Amino acid sequence: MKYIGAHVSAAGGVENAPKNAGLIGATAFALFTKNQRQWKAKTLTEKSILGFKEACRTLGYGPGQILAHDSYLINLGHPDRESLEKSRAAFVDEMERCQQLGISLLNFHPGSHLGRIDIDPCLATIAASINLALEQTQDVTAVIENTAGQGTNLGFDFSQIRTIIDQVEDKTRVGVCLDTCHSFSAGYDLKSEHGFHQTFETFDRVIGFDYLKGMHLNDSTKAMGSRVDRHASLGQGTLGMAPFERIMKDTRFDNIPLILETPDPSLWASEIQQLRAFL
């Protein structure tokens, strides 16, 4: 089964996210459980929590079809101790919010060294941050998203993600979300048929499909290897539609949330239909 959806708005309360997903014919969805550009947020009310769970039940969204996304402000590899502790506390809060809502997957960007520490110590700090969060929470998997490698962001190379996973103590609660735009911008060829198969052979060898918990399906405005993160609507960028057809026809991508983060929400319903037509 292919679970296809988009990162929908939770404006007015998290309980609105499942409804917004239903309106575009989605069988999966992503959401922010709080304002993604603020450190602090009001605690979730009992009304919102019950409303979210009831909407998911009514519309048929199980935990494996929902991929929460954490705040953009969080940097679990921050070289400054005070800023790191602030990020770690915010990440635990994000995990706890997922726990309250019955969401089992929290997607996050691994972190950045900011040009102030070497890569390996930064990766170790990210892993330590994950360990601390997992110790303080339960039932939620920390899902590392690969990045485009823009600026000093880490996680653009599969081996960097593997290094983080190797240092996470509870391997049952860590996973990976692959973003097609990020992968392509980081230099992984998803466009050609040979490159597509080679990329996922590499992913399986270095990380392993057992860790794949979700995907972001985005075209890219930039060339392969550009290390620039700019999403495009499906078929309107440098990737084209072929990679997305391959993903739809490949059973390795079954039973995980496949989430659009394409820039035009008015196209999401038709993009979902396009993807379904490949099945």
Swiss-Prot record:
Q: Name one Pfam family in it.
A: AP_endonuc_2
Query: Which EC number applies?
Result: 3.1.21.2
Its keywords, alphabetically, are: DNA damage, DNA repair, Endonuclease, Hydrolase, Metal-binding, Nuclease, Zinc
Enumerate the NCBIfam families for this protein.
nfo, PRK01060.1-4
Q: Give the GO molecular function terms.
A: deoxyribonuclease IV (phage-T4-induced) activity; DNA binding; DNA-(apurinic or apyrimidinic site) endonuclease activity; phosphoric diester hydrolase activity; zinc ion binding
Residues reported to bind Zn(2+) 2: 145, 179, 216, 261
Residues involved in Zn(2+) 3 binding: 182, 229, 231
**InterPro entries reported for this sequence:** AP_endonuc_2, AP_endonuc_F2_Zn_BS, Xyl_isomerase-like_sf, Xyl_isomerase-like_TIM-brl
Q: Which SMART domains match?
A: AP2Ec
Q: Any idea which positions bind Zn(2+) 1?
A: 69, 109, 145
GO BP term (any one): base-excision repair
Recorded hits in SUPFAM superfamilies, A to Z, give: Xylose isomerase-like
- State the function annotated in the UniProt record: Endonuclease IV plays a role in DNA repair. It cleaves phosphodiester bonds at apurinic or apyrimidinic (AP) sites, generating a 3'-hydroxyl group and a 5'-terminal sugar phosphate.
How is the cofactor bound, in the record's words? Binds 3 Zn(2+) ions.
Query: Its catalytic activity?
Result: Endonucleolytic cleavage to 5'-phosphooligonucleotide end-products
Q: List the protein's name.
A: Probable endonuclease 4
Q: Which cofactor does it need?
A: Zn(2+)
Which family is this protein grouped under?
Belongs to the AP endonuclease 2 family.
